[in-house]
């Protein structure tokens, strides 16, 4: 990870700025992040840097975008992300929001400090950056939800940290009710179709195991994860995929032709029958956000087309409107 170590020279001034835990008064806002670490603020954050796309998405759902003063660079460099986040925030459309890092590769500590954040939201895997920021007295809320329970805790905690707790309650109440509705519609399926999920960018042999967000999506959709491994992100070989022989192959930001070009996979029934589906545009299906419910709805319809339970157009409109409010109109254009 390319972290700018020269930022350590700013340690003394940052520690004296009052951001440290020792300066927090009684009655502070206290939440626990994915690491199990307490994050404390004396009042709701006015200046937040968000370096994790799922959490940035959540900020707009929470109507907390007015607190965002920095984002991850990937929002600008990924054409699909830029297209939709531009619709959520004119500052992104004009490329005015500073981008001091990426969610998984690099973080510029000096640029973060220059923005004088009250809070930095960052992927828990960025351990070096987190350590430096916390050593410099910056409050860090680490994220990387692996299931709905953790995602709900993340939304609730960020709501508290940004003064949008009531909106967080609204979001979670709607989401829980919608998830119950989806489960009720899919629970009758006895013979579940098997689905293999391939990671983005043509990584056909990188998949999601039983302990993953996509597996949770599969269960909600009433399908079975073809991957039998208990781990989150296994890498497999062609022989293993052939032995699983899934009914459908689900792709993310990958051209199906990349799959069809792999001659060794021509024996798969999903390939023979062209049962390959791409969730696109990916913005509407991000499993690291509350939009996992829409991904499940579409996957269910794709797998059980003869007995569709959901109107995709109506559900997209309903879900996005409840998640984003008035901003959903621009997203759905």
Regions found by a protein language model. Name each.
Residues 28-31, 128-204, 227-229, 278-333:
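Extracytoplasmic substrate-binding proteins
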Residues 11-14:
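C-terminal motif of bacterial Sec signal peptides marking the signal peptidase cleavage site
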Residues 97, 103, 108-122, 138, ...:
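Proline-aspartate-enriched helix->loop->beta-strand connector
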Residues 56-111, 119:
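A short, structured surface patch at a secondary-structure boundary
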Residues 16-18:
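Bacterial signal peptide processing site
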């Amino acid at each position: 990870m390319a972290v700018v170590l020269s930022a350590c020279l700013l340690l003394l001034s940052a520690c004296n700025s009052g951001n440290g835990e020792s300066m927090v008064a009684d009655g502070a806002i206290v939440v626990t992040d994915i690491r199990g670490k307490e994050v404390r603020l004396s009042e709701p954050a006015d200046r937040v840097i968000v370096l994790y796309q799922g959490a940035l998405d959540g900020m707009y759902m929470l109507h907390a975008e007015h607190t965002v003063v920095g984002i991850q660079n990937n929002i600008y460099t990924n054409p699909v992300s830029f297209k939709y986040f531009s619709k959520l925030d004119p500052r992104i459309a004009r490329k005015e929001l500073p981008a001091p890092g990426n969610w998984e590769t690099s973080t510029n500590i000096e640029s973060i400090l220059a923005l004088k954040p009250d809070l930095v939201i960052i992927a828990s895997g960025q351990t070096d950056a987190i350590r430096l920021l916390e050593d410099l007295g910056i409050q860090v809320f680490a994220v990387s939800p692996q299931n709905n329970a953790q995602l709900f805790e993340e939304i609730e905690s960020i709501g508290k940290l940004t003064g949008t707790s009531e909106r967080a309650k609204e979001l979670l109440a709607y989401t829980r009710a919608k998830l119950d509705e989806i489960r009720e519609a899919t629970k009758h399926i006895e013979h579940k179709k098997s689905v293999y999920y391939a990671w983005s960018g043509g990584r056909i042999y990188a998949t999601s195991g039983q302990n993953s967000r996509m597996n949770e999506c599969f269960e909600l959709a009433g399908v079975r994860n073809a991957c039998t491994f208990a781990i989150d992100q296994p890498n497999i070989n062609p022989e293993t995929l052939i032995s699983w022989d899934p009914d459908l192959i689900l792709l993310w930001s990958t051209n199906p032709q990349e799959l069809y070009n792999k001659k060794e996979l021509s024996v798969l029934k999903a390939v023979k029958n062209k049962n390959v589906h791409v969730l696109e545009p990916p913005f509407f299906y991000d499993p690291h956000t509350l939009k996992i419910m829409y991904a499940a709805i579409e996957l269910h319809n794709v797998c059980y087309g003869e007995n569709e339970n959901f109107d995709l157009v109506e559900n997209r409109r309903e879900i996005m409107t409840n998640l984003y409010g008035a901003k959903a109109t621009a997203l759905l254009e």
